[in-house]
Amino acid sequence: VEQYPDNFIAIAKHNYYQETPEALKSPTYDYDLTGTWPYCTVDRIFTFDPVPANSLANVRAALELGTSVALDAVATFVPENPNRVNVSATAQFTAADNEANYRFAFAVVEDGITGYKQNNAYAGNKNGEMGGFESKGSSASVTLNHVARSGYGVKEGIENSIPQSVNEYNPINYSTVLDLPSTVINRDNIKVVAFIINKKKGSIENAVQVNVTEQGETAIADVNATQTPD
């Protein structure tokens, strides 16, 4: 995230071992990886052990691929209902396509979650460097960021959200209302991630992350046709 703050969106799913606290699980974020944990995927193209060297190399590789669609989004709390979020996303394709197979999807993530300890496989520098975890004990207190709280179409995309025929730079708009789960601790720390799934490739074509604001405030993030891995 530090290396590519404008091009990288992190989503952390906590659900890979039996002792995962229920409050950290997100059953609606139903895109799963296979293999041992921790595991990472960038745009659902590159999958790897997220040590720093691997992470940077795979993010750079994803950025070099580019994208065929620009994306922006806006998210606001529903007036008088803080547990619901209005979200609108707009896509613009860089070329016309009469056989487009893309879909919108959304996720809610939360930052600043405390009160948890994490088993630390990097304690004592046993497995190399890992962002300071190599100098911590076998059980380390952590502040969790980018935690997946809920997903909306994240596995297959929302059906019929993008038409089969798209024109060059013609805006395609999609709006919906997201219900926040009870696991959200602080709504001031949540963000909405909008992304476009390329159904032909099974990959993420582009994504954008926005803050959720009160109705009337502005929270728009505009992403051009530069690849944005998640």
Predicted regions and their residues:
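Residue-level detector of functionally pivotal "anchor" positions at catalytic/ligand-binding pockets or at interdomain
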Residues: 212-229
